[in-house]
Amino acid sequence: MKIIKYVLSLAILNLIALILVTLGLPDIVPLHINIFGAIDSFGSKWFIPIIGMIPVLIAVIYIIYTYYLQSDLNKEIENKIIPTIAIIFIPFTWILVIFSLKFSDTVNSLHPSTNFASINIIVFVLVILALLFIFISFYLENLKQNWYIGIRTPWTLKNELVWKKTHKLGKYTFRIGGILLLIHAIAVFLTFNFFYAIIGLIMVIIIIAGIPILYSYKEYKKIKK
């Protein structure tokens, strides 16, 4: 509980910093990067502090949850995973700021420097996600059946044995997926290919989430026969 309060304080300070930085940005800033690493969408600079609200909201909602809804079932694991997710969102909130400081709304989105910045940011995102997946993998198998956190499919929620088997498998898919994503991040950095960075990320997500979902369905049908 103390950790999430520290995270909330950090998230609020981060939001204040984002607001102060936003005041000095152009009124129109880059908001979206396509699969080729080019900026293809612009909008109001005040979208940046809105993104900065995400870690604040995660922390606030979790604090409310701990007071009124949290049980002892997965308390220890939840108190590690949720604050970590909130902390990880904080550096993500600065991605648009980085682009805004480098480019204005008149920048040609195909300029080489734009693609270079895009690659650096996607590599950063891949590494953070990889570490998050690996971190979560150490706790998945010990998660008890619940409606809030874990691999929640219709079949894991209906059957406790399916829940246990799916999360045991998920421990390995998350860990393997995280390691593959780290390797992929290095490859993206070396090859300078934004398109394949996105394709690789999608493939890893299929490994991490798709396999356990299909497995839970298969196991549930097997038990019901």
What are these regions (language model features)?
Residues 6-8, 50-52, 61-63, 81-89, ...:
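Select subsegments of transmembrane alpha-helices in polytopic membrane proteins
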Residues 64-117:
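Ordered, amphipathic secondary-structure segments that act as subunit-interaction surfaces
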Residues 21-25, 57-68, 135-151, 215-222:
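Membrane-water interface of transmembrane alpha-helices
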Residues 128, 196-212:
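Small-residue-rich transmembrane alpha-helices that serve as helix-helix interface/gating elements
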Residues 1-11, 46:
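N-terminal membrane topogenic signal
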Residues 19-50, 149-158:
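Active-site and channel-lining beta-strand-loop segments
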Residues 153-169:
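Short membrane-interface loop/juxtamembrane segments of multi-pass integral membrane proteins
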Residues 41-55, 118-136, 203-204:
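Alpha-helical transmembrane segments
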